[in-house]
């Protein structure tokens, strides 16, 4: 199961890397960042294919998207100086809490 979560973490990493390149592509007019973005997204989805065998797709997708959103918000603040209201920050932490709860109780409740 550890290997599955490593694949999921890799998918989150590649999805975040691709998303962070979106502004750099300048509406897909810059070839190198666009190619890198495409490569990163393909890697993310490739890794997700290994996760779907072990984790229910709803749990996998909630984890992947939730952790991606949280990470992108932090990196957006660091690299692009994007700020969030305290309510948005609270919401991001609730997403992480939700991901933890969903993964903690998957398969234990019928």
Place the predicted regions along the sequence by residue.
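Polytopic alpha-helical membrane proteins, predominantly small-molecule transporters/carriers
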Residues: 1-110
């Amino acid at each position: 199961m550890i290997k599955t979560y490593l694949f999921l973490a890799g998918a989150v990493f590649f999805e975040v890397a691709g998303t962070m390149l979106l502004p750099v592509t300048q509406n897909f007019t810059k070839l190198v960042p666009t190619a890198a973005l495409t490569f990163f997204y393909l890697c993310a989805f490739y890794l997700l294919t290994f996760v779907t065998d072990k984790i229910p797709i709803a749990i996998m997708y909630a984890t992947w998207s939730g952790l991606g959103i949280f990470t992108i918000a932090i990196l957006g603040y660091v690299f692009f100086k994007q700020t969030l209201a305290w309510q948005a920050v609270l919401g991001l932490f609730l997403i992480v809490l939700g991901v933890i709860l969903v993964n903690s109780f998957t398969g234990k409740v019928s």
